[in-house]
Design a protein with these regions (language model features):
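Intrinsically disordered, low-complexity N-terminal segments that are enriched in acidic
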Residues: 1-45
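Low-complexity, flexible helical/coil segments
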Residues: 15, 69-77, 178-179, 235-236
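Tryptophan-centered motif/residue detector
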Residues: 22-24, 107, 197, 207
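Extracellular structured ligand-interaction cores
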Residues: 30-36, 195-197, 207
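Secondary-structure boundary elements
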Residues: 31-33, 37-137, 145-148
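Short, low-complexity, polar/charged sequence segments that are solvent-exposed and flexible
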Residues: 52-61, 178-179, 217-220, 228-231
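Active-site neighborhood of thiol-dependent amide/isopeptide-bond enzymes
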Residues: 93, 97-102, 106-196, 203, ...
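A recognition module on extended beta-rich or small alphabeta surfaces enriched in W/G with H and D/E
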Residues: 189-190, 197-237
């Protein structure tokens, strides 16, 4: 619905992200466009369900062409210089990709904090964050650090941008607002629900979700320390 001339959703971009394009008459006094979507969600809980409990990487790891894209550096996701230095220090001599990812995630949980003064979700400039030593930010900043360190450690990783769809029922016992919220009828106002999380790829398994930033967000909202049992429970989840 609306007074647009044309509107469509396309995935014709480098990362296949669904993007809405719309045009209006240049003289339109008001630009209206209403979109209705039916969303289906599912839980992805590989750690909770023990799906990776006995994970062992293949002897010879070969990534497909599309996965190899997520090993490459970008403008904000550098994989050399200070990023590589941090990655090497964090993972040490570990060779198992899952354990390397866990070391990186735990390092971020232990060392990074959420800064609510950051505009939007942050810009995710990892090199700047590590160079300045100001280990703070919002979701794009914190989860981009995970992605950069993972790539620098030889693990394909990517940011996933989207919108929280309401309350996270399973995480509500740790925080009523940090992971999304809804009213008494279960209806959520998603206009402020923009979020960036991350995923890393394990050969022989697939993409694994990780959200170091939400641990920092919960800590700030609930005034929890890194060592608090709730912090560690959310980090493990």
């Amino acid at each position: 619905e609306g007074n647009y001339l044309d509107a469509y959703v396309t995935e014709n971009n480098k990362y296949g992200a669904k993007t809405l394009f719309a045009t209006w008459d240049k003289d339109a006094q008001k630009r209206d466009l209403k979109i209705t979507m039916v969303i289906e969600t599912k839980d992805r809980e590989p750690m909770v369900k023990g799906a990776l409990e006995n994970y062992k990487p293949p002897k010879d790891i070969h990534y497909s062409v599309d996965v190899q894209e997520y090993l490459k550096p970008t403008q904000h996701i550098k994989t050399d210089g200070i990023v590589k230095q941090f990655a090497d220090k964090i993972v040490g001599t570990e060779t198992n990709p899952l354990k390397k990812a866990e070391l990186i995630h735990q390092w971020i949980v232990n060392n990074m904090e959420r800064d609510n003064s950051v505009l939007g979700c942050g810009d995710g400039d990892v090199e700047k964050i590590l160079t300045t030593g100001v280990l703070k930010g919002k979701c794009t900043d914190i989860n981009s650090v995970f992605v950069a360190l993972a790539r620098a450690s030889g693990i394909p990783a990517r940011e996933i941008f989207g919108i929280r769809l309401g309350a996270a029922d399973k995480m509500g016992k740790y925080s009523k607002g940090a992971f999304g919220s809804a009213d008494e009828h279960g209806v959520a106002n998603v206009s402020g629900g923009q979020h960036c999380r991350a995923e890393f790829y394990l050969a022989g398994f697939g993409w694994v979700p990780v959200d170091s930033a939400d641990v920092a967000k919960m800590r700030l909202a609930e005034k929890k320390s890194v060592d608090d049992k709730d912090t560690q429970a959310v980090a493990k989840y």
